[in-house]
Amino acid sequence: EGFKKMLDGIAELDGYAYIGAGRDDGEDAGEHSAIFYKTSRFDLLDKGNFWFSETPDVPGKGWDATCCNRICSWGKFRDKESGKVFYFFNSHYDHQGKVARRESSKLLIARIKQIAGTDATVFATGDFNAVPTDEPMVTLASDGLLLDSYDLSEQPRYGTEGTYNSFKTDSEMMNRIDYIWVTKGTKVKKYAV
């Protein structure tokens, strides 16, 4: 999550660009679920955004969300070294609405299938505001299209168990709410927080 001014600052790093729109207007306003990529390594082939709501093609809140518009930005990329094509989706789910989080998972799966199909290599990352046993994550896992990289690491996982500390720097991070989902056939060499 980042605001345009923050993202533009990061993009000043040599050789990087980003895609993604502001969640409030589909342009620059509000937080972005941006995707940064190294331009010397990857070609951007296509890109887009959708909102986690009943009207995903226009900015808005969905279902029982009360706070903010929530957005997913995606890109289709080609690796210049291998020639392989893949899709990358970056999401931020609502932090209050249970129905919104569940329906967001259903919408994410539907949009991945619509945009990338079922045989493409896909990475789906983000702040899902849900622990692995919560309904939104169970919904993603039970569909079978996406696999949680946490479970696929070839090497033992390291770092903290969780990814969220309630903004308390001295607290133990036990709640995992940020994920990297991948499609079948994706090799996960390491997993760390």
Language-model-detected regions and their locations in the chain:
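Solvent-exposed, acidic/flexible segments
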Residues: 1-3, 29, 68, 98-105, ...
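Divalent metal-dependent phosphoesterase catalytic cores across multiple superfamilies
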Residues: 1-16, 100-118
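Structured beta-strand-rich core segments of catalytic domains in phosphoester-bond hydrolases
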Residues: 2-85, 192-193
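Loop/turn elements at helix/coil->beta-strand transitions in domains of secreted/extracellular proteins
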Residues: 13-18, 82-87, 117-122, 144-147
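Glycine-/small-residue-rich active-site loops that bind phosphorylated ligands and cofactors
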Residues: 24-28, 96, 129
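Active-site metal-binding loops of divalent metal-dependent hydrolases
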Residues: 91-93, 126-128
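Metal-dependent phosphoester-hydrolase catalytic domains
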Residues: 99, 103, 110-122, 130-193
